Amino acid sequence: MTTYFKLVKGATKIKSAPPKQKYLDPILLGTSNEEDFYEIVKGLDSRINDTAWTIVYKSLLVVHLMIREGSKDVALRYYSRNLEFFDIENIRGSNGSASGDMRALDRYDNYLKVRCREFGKIKKDYVRDGYRTLKLNSGNYGSSRNKQHSINIALDHVESLEVQIQALIKNKYTQYDLSNELIIFGFKLLIQDLLALYNALNEGIITLLESFFELSHHNAERTLDLYKTFVDLTEHVVRYLKSGKTAGLKIPVIKHITTKLVRSLEEHLIEDDKTHNTFVPVDSSQGSAGAVVAKSTAQERLEQIREQKRILEAQLKNEQVAISPALTTVTAAQSYNPFGTDSSMHTNIPMAVANQTQQIANNPFVSQTQPQVMNTPTAHTEPANLNVPEYAAVQHTVNFNPVQDAGVSAQQTGYYSINNHLTPTFTGAGFGGYSVSQDTTAASNQQVSHSQTGSNNPFALHNAATIATGNPAHENVLNNPFSRPNFDEQNTNMPLQQQIISNPFQNQTYNQQQFQQQKMPLSSINSVMTTPTSMQGSMNIPQRFDKMEFQAHYTQNHLQQQQQQQQQQQQQQQQQPQQGYYVPATAGANPVTNITGTVQPQNFPFYPQQQPQPEQSQTQQPVLGNQYANNLNLIDM
């Protein structure tokens, strides 16, 4: 057993899968050598006579690939002289021809047989040579004798192309047939052959129609018959290619000459049957005059056909240009938009932030209407022309993009950009709170002022609030977290929407978070008041704190609490039992400079050394109650 016979056997295994490339490549290379080619042919002869459907079908696939990709015209020349290779009688006798697989095998075998037979007639493979060879055969006529010979060759080649296409389009498959991998592999090869053959046929028809009025009457009738067949084949080819698209194959759009010349050509032939002036050689003067008239009419029709050819060639060259104007129009429409945004200014900003900033900053009507945040999930607004409290128009925005480029500053587009009387001033407290200007009560009946979008500096808001008050001491009041003269009044008249901002655990906008991160120390963020762990179960007090109540009571009762805590700690050291609990830290001498000493709890339990007396355990509970009675002021009930 030779090497090529083994390769053929491996390429035509009974397995229902396309031939592997490791077998096909050596076989295709072997077609360039005559001895190797004959060994391949012997191996295929033994496999084509097998009774297994997969082996026979894969043998035909190998022959098809040798015709398409092997040495040029080697396989076609051999099988055109040995058409008996395609007589697959053994498998027909064993399996019959009723099944769908057998019908597909017969149609595929017949197409390859027709392909080889037509090559024996015209000695031309238009799948590999292309349609340009057909154009050259009829282009340069030379003498009239050569002209007629070239036209006859063109007629023969066009007729052969139509026969091959008719045999090819008979290989129709259903969706069930295309589920077979072998049939899909062969179907792809058929589609590629059909595109090449149809392009060659289209060029041949154009060549014949250009010379239609210069042909003999017999050749003109033959050309008309070929043109009618071409019109019918065009419809079938289009349907066949559509079936390839449904199978998931990439099918290009085919271009062909018009199919509406049948009637005009028939009328011309009928007229010539009556006059006998169009295709008859002219010898007399009378005939010459009649020929001039007839020639002028024929020339007009010839020019029409040539115009059809020029249109077709323009369509083939400008196939992609037909799609590009739509894209150019869309690009031109998008190049200038007076109401759009400038993309060059926001190349490094995320889409949501850029849209939100540009819709407010570039809108000329934003100063006349209530500002709205387009991309925020929740927004609570009030009309600007109503007499409502100054905090009723608070917008709560949630920014889902906490990361922003360092080179782009954040612009105030929320409520603080249009309300000067409510400024997010940092208080310095451990809860990240913000103070409220004292001039808010005086501006309660004022409407919302124009939006301020000129400044991107978050510190400019603090300066604007300081200048607006006109009081030099007001800046100190804002910077002092313990100076709250009118806090209780403002807190009682404050609506629920504004109190949401006072919640230290409430989500803040990105501008407030950026301002807080620049000025708030890390130690003050982590300082949170907690109750002793031993008292949480009995007191049933929720662990929620309000920074405003803490600051108000702290400024009023701080000194009293300091004295009481010192006395209570002395009593605790004498009367406290062995049970350990956390003791709040003693406040420093200066309540302003030593804030963290009164806010942070001790991190270790306290165990007194003295043993308590049995009779003193009954008096311990009121002492503990007095001890934490004052500390309850620090907890939001």
Swiss-Prot record:
GO terms for cellular component: cellular bud neck; clathrin-coated pit; clathrin-coated vesicle; plasma membrane; prospore membrane. One of its GO terms (molecular function) is phosphatidylinositol-4,5-bisphosphate binding. Residues 1-126 form the ENTH domain. It is a peripheral membrane protein. Coiled coil: none annotated. It is found in: Bud; Bud neck; Cell membrane; Cytoplasm. Residues 560-579, 600-622 have a biased composition (Low complexity). InterPro entries: ANTH_dom, ANTH_dom_sf, AP180-like, ENTH, ENTH_VHS. It holds the Pfam family ANTH. Residues 555-637 are annotated as: Disordered. Keywords: Cell membrane, Cytoplasm, Endocytosis, Membrane. Residues 623-637 have a biased composition (Polar residues). Residues 587-637 are annotated as: Clathrin-binding. CDD domains: ANTH_N_YAP180. Its main location: other. GO terms for biological process: clathrin coat assembly; clathrin-dependent endocytosis; endocytosis; vesicle budding from membrane. Involved in endocytosis and clathrin cage assembly. Interacts with PAN1 and the clathrin heavy and light chains CHC1 and CLC1. Present with 623 molecules/cell in log phase SD medium. Belongs to the AP180 family. This is Clathrin coat assembly protein AP180A. It comes from Saccharomyces cerevisiae (strain ATCC 204508 / S288c). The gene is YAP1801.
